[in-house]
Amino acid sequence: KLSDLKLIDRSPKIIAVSKTFKLDHINPLIDHGHIDFGENKVQEAVEKWTDIKKEKSELKIHLVGRLQTNKVKFALKVFDYIHSLDSKKLAVKISEEQAKHKIKPKIFIQINIGDESQKGGIRVDELEEFYNYCIELNLDIIGTMCLPPISDEPEKYFSRMSYLNKKFNFKESSMGMSSDYLEAIQYNATYLR
């Protein structure tokens, strides 16, 4: 599939999702220069990455799972990126904690692009109001994230996300995983999980 990537004129960042893997399995990637890693759970990430980030400040750790408000203060200590901002309550908590600790993560607004009740994320029709609310809270919103429905073709959802990112002038787009990354790249994904 690397040959497929050569057909595309951009180089999206690949987030190696390292959840459940111990550092001795991850170190070979770090030794070869990979710097973007994703975790789903705050506690696991804090235990795994806190010390190594002190030694290797170039590492960028991404929260790719849901974030509960009671975990925000811990999350800000280790995560450089949060891909799952999906509520005003969470936005307020991140704003409060980043002001206290003088840490400002880069944040993706999670869009429930398939309008699925079992998934997090804000509805498409809420994006403008929610984005403006986040800006008032001094959050560093850099783009959007989505997980398209598994049972459907991802292209139509990625196309919609690409439209939204252009409309709001977002520079970054977090979408695409191992099963649909080529389609995501075609619709301007800048981060792949």
Tell what function each PLM region has.
Residues K1-E172, M177-S179, Y187:
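Conserved alpha/beta-domain cores
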Residues T190-L192:
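Divalent-metal-activated hydrolytic enzyme cores
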